Amino acid sequence: MVHAEAFSRPLSRNEVVGLIFRLTIFGAVTYFTIKWMVDAIDPTRKQKVEAQKQAEKLMKQIGVKNVKLSEYEMSIAAHLVDPLNMHVTWSDIAGLDDVITDLKDTVILPIKKKHLFENSRLLQPPKGVLLYGPPGCGKTLIAKATAKEAGCRFINLQPSTLTDKWYGESQKLAAAVFSLAIKLQPSIIFIDEIDSFLRNRSSSDHEATAMMKAQFMSLWDGLDTDHSCQVIVMGATNRPQDLDSAIMRRMPTRFHINQPALKQREAILKLILKNENVDRHVDLLEVAQETDGFSGSDLKEMCRDAALLCVREYVNSTSEESHDEDEIRPVQQQDLHRAIEKMKKSKDAAFQSVLTHVCLD
């Protein structure tokens, strides 16, 4: 039986040290056990680890040294694109000479020749640029070429990156987007299909989503207060009418990337077929006249179909043992005509499907 006086007597030095040691061990074991359990039940843990490794690799590639990044900035850095690895230049874009000229004057020149513009607030590069127009007309290509030519770090931001199941994490990720961009400036934050992320706000929006959007716009406004900051938010959309009016205000520089006109289609066709095996008698102006309403993406797919016709014809006319690439005939005018008809039927079928859906609604 333990006497009552045993509890009332003071502890010896060895007993105190032993108690502290046991409590320390217990606390450490408890901490790491809880941490392991939280990591085990987190379905995104593996993706976060991979994202951190990818971010560290990209930071080395772009030559960023002695820049300390937070956990959230590392998550965003995984979406960095090294300008040197962008194999897109202005020469890869045809039919948009006016847009390219304006972009060079308003965006690229103030970044590359900063010393010429530093004394004027009016001549600073815009903090927001919107590229809008029908799908398949080169909006994303223009954004990449702009970053390449300006030598900017390119953050290809996916809206899903900013969503997190834990309350408050989305706001921290939104803050990390801008803090990372500032550390890596000059930089471009590119948001493709920006209407899906920053569309018109309504009372039906989830609280976390509304707070994240508000945080994003608040940080975006902060770029305007620092006129020496070289961070640009560039968005692309084919539904500008769905964008929140507050977002439109923050993107004063807008470029309409419309479907190519006749001369633009001819220039695009020349670019697509420049290094292909094409018959010298092919009249690209005639092809351009027959492709009214085609986007740049449609023209590329049409040319691909025409080239495949030549390959299919060769494969069907020879045995497997005698295949020789040199014997494949060049693309002729008739191949392009057949590909155009196929593309028109495909577009008409898609249009009829949309009309049927609208009528049923």
Curated annotation (Swiss-Prot):
UniProt keyword annotations, A-Z: ATP-binding, Cell membrane, Membrane, Mitochondrion, Mitochondrion outer membrane, Nucleotide-binding, Peroxisome, Phosphoprotein, Postsynaptic cell membrane, Synapse, Translocase, Transmembrane, Transmembrane helix
Result for mutant: residue 193 to Q: ATPase activity reduced by 60%-70%. ATPase activity reduced by 92%
Mitochondrial intermembrane side: 1-15
Coarse class of the protein's main subcellular location: mitochondrion
Localization in the cell: Mitochondrion outer membrane; Peroxisome membrane; Postsynaptic cell membrane
Nucleus among keywords: no
One GO CC annotation: glutamatergic synapse
GO biological process: extraction of mislocalized protein from mitochondrial outer membrane; learning; memory; negative regulation of synaptic transmission, glutamatergic; positive regulation of receptor internalization; regulation of postsynaptic neurotransmitter receptor internalization
SMART domains to which the protein is assigned, alphabetical: AAA
Pfam families from the UniProt entry: AAA, AAA_lid_3
Positions on the Cytoplasmic side per record topology: 33-361
EC number of the protein: 7.4.2.-
SUPFAM superfamilies found in the cross-reference section: P-loop containing nucleoside triphosphate hydrolases
Residues where ATP binds: 133-140
Record has DNA-binding as a keyword: no
Transmembrane segments: 16-32
Cleaved signal peptide residues: none
Catalysed transformations (reactions): [protein]-with a C-terminal TM segment(out) + ATP + H2O = [protein]-with a C-terminal TM segment(in) + ADP + phosphate + H(+)
GO molecular function: ATP binding; ATP hydrolysis activity; membrane protein dislocase activity
Subunit: Interacts with GRIA2 and GRIP1 in an ATP-dependent manner. ATAD1-catalyzed ATP hydrolysis disrupts not only its binding to GRIA2 and GRIP1, but also interaction between GRIP1 and GRIA2, leading to AMPAR complex disassembly.
Entries under PANTHER family matching the protein: AAA ATPASE, PUTATIVE (AFU_ORTHOLOGUE AFUA_2G12920)-RELATED-RELATED (PTHR45644), OUTER MITOCHONDRIAL TRANSMEMBRANE HELIX TRANSLOCASE (PTHR45644:SF2)
Function as written in the Swiss-Prot or TrEMBL entry: Outer mitochondrial translocase required to remove mislocalized tail-anchored transmembrane proteins on mitochondria. Specifically recognizes and binds tail-anchored transmembrane proteins: acts as a dislocase that mediates the ATP-dependent extraction of mistargeted tail-anchored transmembrane proteins from the mitochondrion outer membrane. Also plays a critical role in regulating the surface expression of AMPA receptors (AMPAR), thereby regulating synaptic plasticity and learning and memory.
Family: Belongs to the AAA ATPase family. MSP1 subfamily.
Name of the protein in its database record: Outer mitochondrial transmembrane helix translocase
Native source organism of the sequence: Rattus norvegicus
